[in-house]
Amino acid sequence: MAVGKNKRLSKGKKGQKKRVVDPFTRKEWFDIKAPSTFENRNVGKTLVNKSTGLKSASDALKGRVVEVCLADLQGSEDHSFRKIKLRVDEVQGKNLLTNFHGMDFTTDKLRSMVRKWQTLIEANVTVKTSDDYVLRIFAIAFTRKQANQVKRHSYAQSSHIRAIRKVISEILTKEVQGSTLAQLTSKLIPEVINKEIENATKDIFPLQNIHVRKVKLLKQPKFDVGALMALHGEGSGEEKGKKVTGFKDEVLETV
């Protein structure tokens, strides 16, 4: 007899199969909604464990960040190289209301722009928007040949690079400080800032492939439900009650 073995314990039946539970029965689906800044607001679906006890499904979803291709949000393949990050801020039934959380370029697009015989110029600024979002914005540009140029390359001097970087930083700061986060997002989609940088730097050195390649959210203000609803086109920042009409007081004769 082995030490510590209890003969009274009943043994399980040999060959008995273990009960298999489908993990998806404990989960539920939610629809992700993009802000009204984008043309296609239906981003997709996400999974989360069902609410049990003190654990709420909405608490697990708030703060979740999803990455979406801008081509899917705008319905155009011209934006296929840009990725948009959306953060879940509010849960309404089965819908998740999101806000802009950042932007980035795909790796293949960045590598395809880097070529020989040209100078790469990068600049970044940390700015606060008019609605108190602190963003770090990265811009990228490449030099190109001047008109009637004979030389094979289009290298810029250090003085040109410093001057161009200063102009880019000033334009980015001006555009961000005078815009809300939603307004800035609408400027990034058609690349309005890029055209402004190209016109401002053409007297210093001609540029090409100018892009705001990355936007990083560093700090956000206190959460405001009204502002989020206005961003999704589901209400204004102010909620006002309506006067009730057609109501008559009824007098109870007996209690």
Swiss-Prot record:
Record's keyword terms, sorted: Acetylation, Cytoplasm, Isopeptide bond, Phosphoprotein, Ribonucleoprotein, Ribosomal protein, Ubl conjugation
Residues that bear Phosphothreonine: T245, T254
Compartments reported by the entry: Cytoplasm
PTM characteristics: N-terminally acetylated by acetyltransferase NatA.
Any one GO molecular-function label of the UniProt entry: structural constituent of ribosome
Modified residues (N-acetylalanine): A2
Chief location bin: cytoplasm
GO biological-process terms attached to the record: cytoplasmic translation; maturation of SSU-rRNA from tricistronic rRNA transcript (SSU-rRNA, 5.8S rRNA, LSU-rRNA)
PROSITE patterns (UniProt xref): RIBOSOMAL_S3AE
Location of region: Disordered: 1-20
Bias (Basic residues): 1-18
InterPro entries named in the record: Ribosomal_eS1, Ribosomal_eS1_CS, Ribosomal_eS1_euk
A matching Pfam family: Ribosomal_S3Ae
A GO CC annotation given for this chain: 90S preribosome
Residues joined by cross-link Glycyl lysine isopeptide (Lys-Gly) (interchain with G-Cter in ubiquitin): K248
Biological role stated in the UniProt entry: Component of the ribosome, a large ribonucleoprotein complex responsible for the synthesis of proteins in the cell. The small ribosomal subunit (SSU) binds messenger RNAs (mRNAs) and translates the encoded message by selecting cognate aminoacyl-transfer RNA (tRNA) molecules. The large subunit (LSU) contains the ribosomal catalytic site termed the peptidyl transferase center (PTC), which catalyzes the formation of peptide bonds, thereby polymerizing the amino acids delivered by tRNAs into a polypeptide chain.
Note: Present with 92400 molecules/cell in log phase SD medium. There are 2 genes for eS1 in yeast.
Family: Belongs to the eukaryotic ribosomal protein eS1 family.
Subunit organization: Component of the small ribosomal subunit (SSU). Mature yeast ribosomes consist of a small (40S) and a large (60S) subunit. The 40S small subunit contains 1 molecule of ribosomal RNA (18S rRNA) and 33 different proteins (encoded by 57 genes). The large 60S subunit contains 3 rRNA molecules (25S, 5.8S and 5S rRNA) and 46 different proteins (encoded by 81 genes). eS1 interacts directly with uS11 and eS26, which form part of the mRNA exit tunnel.
The protein's name: Small ribosomal subunit protein eS1A
Organism in which the protein naturally occurs: Saccharomyces cerevisiae (strain ATCC 204508 / S288c)
Gene: RPS1A
